[in-house]
Curated annotation (Swiss-Prot):
Lineage start: Eukaryota, Metazoa, Chordata, Craniata, Vertebrata
Gene Ontology, cellular component aspect: mitochondrial inner membrane; respiratory chain complex III
Binding sites annotated in the UniProt record for a ubiquinone: H201
PANTHER family: CYTOCHROME B (PTHR19271:SF16)
UniProt KW Transmembrane helix keyword: yes
Localization per Swiss-Prot or TrEMBL: Mitochondrion inner membrane
Protein's name according to its UniProt entry: Cytochrome b
RNA-binding keyword on record: no
Alphabetically ordered keywords of this record: Electron transport, Heme, Iron, Membrane, Metal-binding, Mitochondrion, Mitochondrion inner membrane, Respiratory chain, Transmembrane, Transmembrane helix, Transport, Ubiquinone
GO terms (BP aspect): mitochondrial electron transport, ubiquinol to cytochrome c
Length: 379
């Protein structure tokens, strides 16, 4: 008897992607984050849909509609906080997923990696426009400051900013279009994630050793479905811990004040997951230079396959590269901390040093150390 999952046109696709998929027998828990990102995306789309049913994208009613969701809608508070903190969990999983790719050399799957970088940009754009929607002080000023960065583009900058704003300042038109973007982008992310998976299943998964595992494959189900369920339970546990015990831990108190164009908050800063890029932006005194550094801080990931000089794919057997990798992680944590600090001594200097170190490790030190390790192998 042939199973329906192997013959039905739709079931066959699901079967080949999640059930009978040949997977390496030695992939660790670092390979759980792909499925966790899928769960996060589904969770965000569902909670977002229910929030959109009650949200009003107008400058006069946006803030009060969010308040109304929290106070009057049945379980509105939990939906709102699951959505807000779900974004934080999404980015934690994203950073882990990208970090895993860097550590184990998964960037050698060019198509998968490049689609992944595009996905990262799209998720960041979605999170940014979403942060504007509650129309609190930090929403308004964050939108003003970040969109204003585009004015650094020569010749067309000012026109471009006014075009995005839909006027001469962040106003009703801006909020309405940001809501439209925030609604449509997750579906674009879903489509991109499917393409990401399509390219991954074309080559098969990488594994911690970086050695081809064609001779040693096991079916995805039940081995990795069980393993993924464990990850999902942990994700939901930590998410609900945040939502039920400290829902505002990662938010900004200023966002509980309605947006006021006449009153600037003392420290304008984005959500925690953008702080590393924000610190890089602030560390350069020139506006255009800062914007370029900001974009390059993420775009540099595209260059990873070109910067790979090692004869080994993974860092598993490369202790010097491992030291550099963890130095990079420490540097990113430092940048995240600096991004949330005021622009004054010593934070400015620390930010500048951390920014230089970030690009130095990725663009210079990693290729050099990899070459040294290649030569050490000859001894």
């Amino acid at each position: 008897m042939t199973y329906i999952r192997k013959t039905h046109p739709l079931m066959k696709i699901v079967n080949n992607a999640f059930i009978d998929l040949p997977a390496p027998s030695n992939i660790s828990s670092w390979w759980n984050f792909g499925s966790l990102l899928g769960i996060c995306l589904i969770l965000q789309i569902l909670t977002g849909l229910f929030l959109a049913m009650h949200y009003a994208s107008d400058t006069t009613t946006a803030f009060s509609s969010v308040t109304h969701i929290c106070r009057d809608v049945n379980y509105g508070w939990i939906i709102r906080y699951m959505h807000a903190n779900g974004a934080s969990m999404f980015f934690i999983c994203l950073f882990m997923h990208v970090g895993r790719g860097l550590y184990y050399g998964s960037y050698t799957f060019l198509e998968t990696w490049n689609i992944g970088v595009i996905l990262l940009f799209t998720v960041m754009a979605t999170a940014f426009v979403g942060y504007v929607l509650p129309w609190g002080q930090m929403s308004f000023w964050g939108a003003t400051v970040i969109t204003n960065l585009l004015s650094a583009i020569p010749y067309i900058g000012t026109n471009l900013v006014e075009w995005i704003w839909g006027g001469f300042s962040v106003d009703k038109a801006t909020l309405t279009r940001f809501f439209a973007f925030h609604f449509i982008l997750p579906f674009i992310i879903t489509a991109l994630a499917m393409i990401h998976l399509l390219f991954l299943h074309d080559t098969g998964s990488n594994n911690p050793t970086g050695i081809p595992s064609d001779a040693d494959k096991i079916p995805f189900h039940p081995y990795y479905t069980i393993k993924d369920i464990m990850g999902v339970l942990l994700l939901i546990f930590f998410l609900m811990l945040l939502v039920l015990f400290a829902p505002d831990l990662l938010g900004d108190p200023d966002n509980y004040t309605p947006a006021n164009p006449l009153n600037t908050p003392p420290h304008i800063k984005p959500e925690w997951y953008f702080l590393f890029a924000y610190a890089i932006l602030r560390s350069i005194p020139n506006k255009l230079g800062g914007v370029l550094a900001l974009v390059l801080s993420i775009l540099v990931l595209i260059l990873m396959p070109l910067l790979h000089t090692s004869k080994q794919r993974s860092m598993m057997f490369r202790p010097f590269s491992q030291c550099l990798f963890w130095a990079l992680v420490a540097d990113l944590l430092t940048l995240t901390w600096i991004g949330g600090q005021p622009v004054e001594y010593p934070f400015v200097v620390i930010g500048q040093l951390a920014s230089i170190l970030y690009f130095l490790i990725i663009l210079v030190l990693m290729p050099i150390i990899s070459t040294i390790e290649n030569n050490l192998l000859k001894w």
